[in-house]
Amino acid sequence: MPRSLKKGPFIDLHLLKKVEKAVESGDKKPIKTWSRRSTIFPNMIGLTIAVHNGRQHVPVFVSDEMVGHKLGEFAPTRTYRGHAADKKAKKR
């Protein structure tokens, strides 16, 4: 269920401060964050945000199609290596 419209979008204040500082200075260095729950705002477009996936920081370049989505959607947390192959089928 989506967030109520009367509440508005959520963003962590520490991340918002870092984004505003990067936009103001024109800095293109990735912004490191653990805040996967924060919504992507229009002032983040063009920035690279390194989102933590539980093991490492995944660089996410923010484009205009991403506005309104959460940062965590673009940093996968699980690695799928496929199911084990059937050994009997391999012999044939």
UniProtKB/Swiss-Prot annotation:
One of its GO terms (molecular function) is rRNA binding. Gene3D superfamilies: 30s Ribosomal Protein S19, Chain A. Pfam families: Ribosomal_S19 (PF00203). Keywords: Ribonucleoprotein, Ribosomal protein, RNA-binding, rRNA-binding. Disulfide bonds: none annotated. The keyword tRNA processing does not apply. One of its GO terms (cellular component) is small ribosomal subunit. InterPro entries: Ribosomal_uS19, Ribosomal_uS19_bac-type, Ribosomal_uS19_CS, Ribosomal_uS19_SF. GO terms for biological process: ribosomal small subunit assembly; translation. PROSITE patterns: RIBOSOMAL_S19. Protein S19 forms a complex with S13 that binds strongly to the 16S ribosomal RNA. Belongs to the universal ribosomal protein uS19 family. NCBIfam families: rpsS_bact (TIGR01050). This is Small ribosomal subunit protein uS19. It comes from Photorhabdus laumondii subsp. laumondii (strain DSM 15139 / CIP 105565 / TT01).
